[in-house]
Amino acid sequence: MTDMIMPLTLILIFAVLSYPLLKPKSYSKSNNSFQAWNAVHVSFLISLIPLTMMLYKESDHVVMCWSWMNTQAFNVDLSFKFDYYSVTFTSIALFITWSILEFASWYMASYPQKELFYKYLLLFLMSMIILVTANNLFQLFIGWEGVGIMSFLLIGWWFGRTEANTASLQAVIYNRMGDIGFILTLAWMAMYLNSWDIQQIFILSKDFDMTIPQIGLIIAATGKSAQFTLHPWLPSAMEGPTPVSALLHSSTMVVAGIFLLIRLHPIMETNKLAPTICLCLGALTTLFAATCALTQNDIKKIVAFSTSSQLGLMMVAIGLNQPHLAFFHICTHAFFKAMLFLCSGAIIHSLNNEQDIRKMGGTYHTLPMTTNYLTIGKMALMGTPFLAGFFSKDAILEAMTTSHLNAWALTLTLIATSFTAVYSFRMIYLVCLGSPRHKTYETIDENHIPTNTIQRLAWGSIIAGLIISYTMIPLKTPILTMPIYLKLAAILVTLLGIILGLEISTLANKINKNTTPGIPFHFSISLIFFPILHRLIPMRKLFMGESAATKIEKSWSELFGPCGIAFTLMTVATFVKDHRMASIKSYLAVFLTSIILKMMMLKLYT
């Protein structure tokens, strides 16, 4: 019975989500977004059926629908895997997309082609559902590329803006670099394992050295989840509309790389190299992104860098061989990250598209509900006890402090945790507190549509961590006893960050405006000089190409081209003229020579 209900619910979800996509364009003035977010709402209610059955029976189900390709040595089947990861994530993604689409009906109300915008968001969601429910790598790759192309279309939605076009191209290019690793893994498994089925890969991989495909998977996750070296596209992605940023950063594209490593983690847990790379890469990413967020003044860019920092923390959990903790943090992070972006969008919309936090302030009086939800989201991000982020973040840090694996990675992660509290409190202080520093606008009225939507996500940011912690079965026995200083390490560094953030925010108002920023400020504001380094290589390539073209055009081309021929003819003519050889014998000799050459050419080509 369960084997029938699971695929039927997935088919029903896709059918409901496809209805707004197949519906022809409506020219009426009615709210076209109602059908989109209502379809997602119904799909979310349907997804609760397999989630309830999964929590009740606690068993995985693999359903094969039909065979795509069948040869003597290689088969590709369309199959779906219904386990705790896929069923839980599908419900969370539908819930968050429902809230985001409802928010978009208010945020994008005055924009043309908003109906197409809702369809793009639905396709974005459907691609992610295909990715998380796939049971073979080829099917997973379809969802992988689906979220990639939809992110390109949505980030560049305002195609009249140069920054949006640049950001969309940047996202595609960096993700193509990550796709090289995925394709390398697909090719290796096709050559040596003769299968892309995930269950068969787990069985067959025990007899092979899986270092090469593991490195390929890490490269793929580095590109898609914006880890260090392939990260610059993620802060730029906030050039898209706020609903796009909320969906992309919370429950779709950026977590696809982490989910790929979670899904294929059994082939990595016995290898020492791959988890070590994940651990060090995640620690470096989380500290780097937190450092960059300290000096940013764009409200959306601060939230974007916090996403990159939390993705690094998820990568650390995978490096600790704790993929269930990484998935736990994906689920809790999705709620408060979507809420933070929607709160930021509501504030920007209310302040006439102002995004600089230095020009805000006093929103606690003008936007009390939005400000309260923003504060809850930031507290959940910091890991405040008993909010959603605390349960997952504290579990990862406890596993880190008791792992005895890498003191360097532990130190970087704890520093990044402290920096998270610093930039979170700085944002709350500059946006919500104090007196307004923006221009005087019309009376700001909090619309019930965005506040109700954000309130729904706020409840998730409060209780989701507790609920998921009771339903998730850990893959390893958790640490039950530890020294008190290790138990309190996460809370202590967070409190230290709050104190430091308060001190920095108060001192910033006393600093002379003419003070020249130092190297640490430029180091942070310029994203650790990565844009400079990434531009340096293309600039050198263009310069070398220009130099080569100039040399060829002005030297070799003219030497053997028009200038060379003209110089040769002039030399011959001058020689004939100077030596007075202009006689009938000379003319006859030249004439006969020309005829002989012509006959030889005709003989050669006939």
Swiss-Prot record:
Core subunit of respiratory chain NADH dehydrogenase (Complex I) which is composed of 45 different subunits. Belongs to the complex I subunit 5 family. InterPro entries: NADH_DH_su5_C, NADHpl_OxRdtase_5_subgr, ND/Mrp_TM, NU5C-like, Proton_antipo_N. It is found in: Mitochondrion inner membrane. Its EC number is 7.1.1.2. One of its GO terms (molecular function) is NADH dehydrogenase (ubiquinone) activity. This is NADH-ubiquinone oxidoreductase chain 5. Its main location: mitochondrion. PANTHER family: NADH-UBIQUINONE OXIDOREDUCTASE CHAIN 5 (PTHR42829:SF2). The gene is mt-nd5. One of its GO terms (biological process) is mitochondrial electron transport, NADH to ubiquinone. Pfam families: NADH5_C (PF06455), Proton_antipo_M (PF00361), Proton_antipo_N (PF00662). Core subunit of the mitochondrial membrane respiratory chain NADH dehydrogenase (Complex I) which catalyzes electron transfer from NADH through the respiratory chain, using ubiquinone as an electron acceptor. Essential for the catalytic activity and assembly of complex I.
